[in-house]
């Protein structure tokens, strides 16, 4: 089994990559390491997994987990992502990468469309063209908007997002559903 994790320097991605690597699962992590969250924290997480970014390499093999490889990559870089999909045989893609932040999305909507919609489309296309059987992705509770029904339910209506961020995550849900129906 070989798993691709996007957003692997983020909080959830780091813990997931580490857990899979510890289990002996071939794990390939990518992350843009953008500055929305503290870059030094992301680098510290990678270092804790045995990834030394100071070596200035294209791919980094973990010194702690020989089955874990990391590459700095933005999902918006379609040629690089296409090359990655063509060079590896992934059984599962776990997409945790996203430009987060509700307030920031109101000031920088294009950043969210690029990362969360176009980037996710590149993931969907990679899975489709390379016949990857499983895609798991993280949505957000933001898709429920101003719903007063708490706790949220998966079958609750989520048709009225109140931020660009929430709209992009709802878009991801609809895109994934459509790709699943069209392409299996």
What do the PLM-derived regions correspond to, one by one?
Residues 1-184:
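N-terminal Rossmann-like NAD(P)+-binding domain of SDR-like oxidoreductases, especially those catalyzing
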């Amino acid at each position: 089994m070989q798993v691709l994790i996007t957003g692997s320097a983020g909080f959830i991605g780091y813990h997931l990559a580490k857990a899979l690597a510890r289990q002996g699962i071939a794990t390939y992590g990518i992350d843009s390491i953008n500055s929305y969250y503290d870059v030094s924290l992301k680098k510290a997480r990678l270092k804790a997994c045995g990834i030394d970014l100071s070596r200035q390499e294209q791919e980094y093999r973990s010194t702690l987990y020989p089955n874990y490889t990391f590459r700095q990559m933005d999902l918006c870089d379609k040629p690089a992502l296409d090359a990655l999909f063509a060079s590896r045989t992934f059984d599962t893609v776990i997409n945790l990468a996203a430009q987060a932040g509700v307030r920031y999305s109101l000031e920088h909507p294009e950043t969210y469309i690029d990362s969360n919609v176009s980037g996710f489309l590149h993931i969907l296309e990679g899975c489709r063209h390379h016949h990857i059987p499983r895609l798991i992705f993280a949505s957000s509770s933001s898709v429920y908007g101003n719903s007063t029904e708490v706790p949220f339910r998966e079958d609750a209506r989520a048709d009225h997002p109140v931020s660009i961020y929430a709209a992009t995550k709802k878009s991801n849900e609809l895109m994934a559903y459509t790709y699943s129906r069209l392409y299996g």
